[in-house]
Amino acid sequence: MREIEFTFKGLLIRLSLALSDLIFFNIALALAIVLINGFPGEILTGIPQHELDLKIATHILLSVICVGWFWVRLRHYTYRKPFWFELKEVFRTILIFSIVDLSVSALSKWELSRWIWILTWLLSMAMVPFGRACVKRLLNRKKLWKKQSIIIGSGKNAQEAWQALQSEEMMGFDVIAFYDVDGSQTALELFGVPVLKEEQQLWSLVDSDTQFIVAVEYEQSQSRDRWLKNLATHNCRSVSVIPSLRGVPLYGTDMAYIFSHEVMILRVSNNLAKHSSRFLKRTFDLVGALSIITLLLPALVILIFMVSRDGGAPIYGHERVGRDGRKFKCLKFRSMVVNSKEVLEEVLRTDPVARAEWDEDFKLKNDPRITRIGHFIRKTSLDELPQLWNVVRGEMSLVGPRPVIEAELERYAGDVDYYFMAKPGMTGLWQVSGRNDVSYETRVYFDSWYVKNWSLWNDIAILFKTIGVVLKRDGAY
C-alpha cells in the first residue's frame, strides 16, 4: 500500500510541475498578444484570423514539446536540481525553442508583429520558473514536496553535504538522520539532526520514497562500496553519491568512465584561462558598468554632494591588489571622517578588543571612524558605486574575488594563486554568502571556489543575489 501511495505522490508532483510549465508557456503568449495589440475586442485588429490561429497552435505545440524535453531529456520533473543550475537549463531550452518559433514564423511569412514573438518568449523565461516555484511552495505546504533523506556518513564530507543541501531549500531534501558508517562519530547529533549508530535504527525510518545520500570520507571507500551494495539489495531507488572532491573545479567538468574498470575520469575546465572567456567577461563588465553608470548618474551626483558636505573629498582610492598581483586604487565614496587614520591608530592603541577584531578581519563592526552618511551608504553598499569606474578601466570586474590589501594576501596561503587569476569584483560569492558575518578562512574559500568554477552564468546569478542581499542589508557594516 505504501508503494502505491508514494508512486502516486511522485506522479502527482511530476504532473503538477509539467502542467504548470504548460499553462505558463501559453499564458505568456496570451499576455504578449494583449500587451502588443490591446485588450479583447482589439486583439484581432490587423491580424488575419487564420494566422492568429496558426500562431496559437504552433506555440501550443512548441510548449508541449518543450515540456516533454524538460521531462524526458533534462528530467526536471523527476530529478531535484539546484535552483540556479535548473534555471540555466530552463533559459537555454526556452531560447532554443524561441529560435525555432522565429524560424517557423519567418518561413510562414505571417504578418504578426515580431514584438509578439519577443515578448512571448521573454515572458516565458520569467513566468515558467515563477510558476514552478509557486507549485513547489504549494506542494510543500501540502507536505508533498519535502523528500525524506538520510545521509550515509557523518564526517566532514557528510556535514558539508548537509550544509549544501540546506542552502538549496527548493530542492526539498529533508535530512532526518546521519548514519555513522564506522563508529568514529562521538556526537549524538549534528546540526540538530540525529546520528544513527545501528542499521536497525536506519531501516526503521525508511520507506519507498526515502532519498539516500552517500557522503563518506575519501578514505572510507570500502564503507561506500558496502553501502551502495546494501542499498541496491534493499531495492532503494533514490540513491545519490557525493564524493569528497573539495578543491576540484566542478563547473564545466565532464565525467567519463573506462569500460569494465571502476575508474571515473573527470575532465576539469579552467574557464578563466580561455581567451574567449576573458573576452566575454570583459564585454559583460563594460556593457554592465556603463549601463549602470548611465542609469544611476543623478543618484551619483547627489551622493557626491552629500558626502563632501564635511569638507573632505567625496571619493577616495585605497590601494588594492588585482589580477597578476598588479596594484590599483580601488575607488569608494568616503564613508569615514577626514582624519580616519589617526582615529584608527588611537582606537587600536587603547582598545584591545578592537585590536583583536582588526587583526582577525581587518574590519571593525562598530567603527568610530564612520560618519552618519557613511553608515547609510555602507549599509546599502552605495559606497562601492565609484568602483564602476574601476570596472570601466579594466582594474576590476562586476563580479570577482573580494579586493584585498597586500597584507591580507598572507591569509590566502596556498590559494593566493587563484586570487591572482581574476580581477577583483564589486560583488562576489563572499558578498552574497554572509559578507562580514563569515570567517576570513571562509572568504578565502569562496574566492577560490569562484575562480575555479567561473562562468558567465555564475556571474549573472551572483549579481541577482547581490540585489537581494543589498535590499536586506545582510552582513553589512
UniProtKB/Swiss-Prot annotation:
Q: Which UniProt keywords apply?
A: Cell membrane, Exopolysaccharide synthesis, Membrane, Transferase, Transmembrane, Transmembrane helix, Virulence
Return the Pfam families for the record: Bac_transf, CoA_binding_3
- State the top-level EC class: transferase
Q: Which GO terms describe its cellular component?
A: plasma membrane
Outline which residue ranges sit on the Cytoplasmic face. 305-477
Q: Which NCBIfam families match?
A: EPS_sugtrans, WbaP_sugtrans
Membership in a protein family:
Belongs to the bacterial sugar transferase family.
Q: What does this protein do?
A: Involved in the biosynthesis of amylovoran which functions as a virulence factor. May act as a sugar transferase and may be involved in the export of the repeating unit by flipping the lipid carrier to the periplasmic face of the inner membrane.
Q: What is this protein called?
A: UDP-galactose-lipid carrier transferase
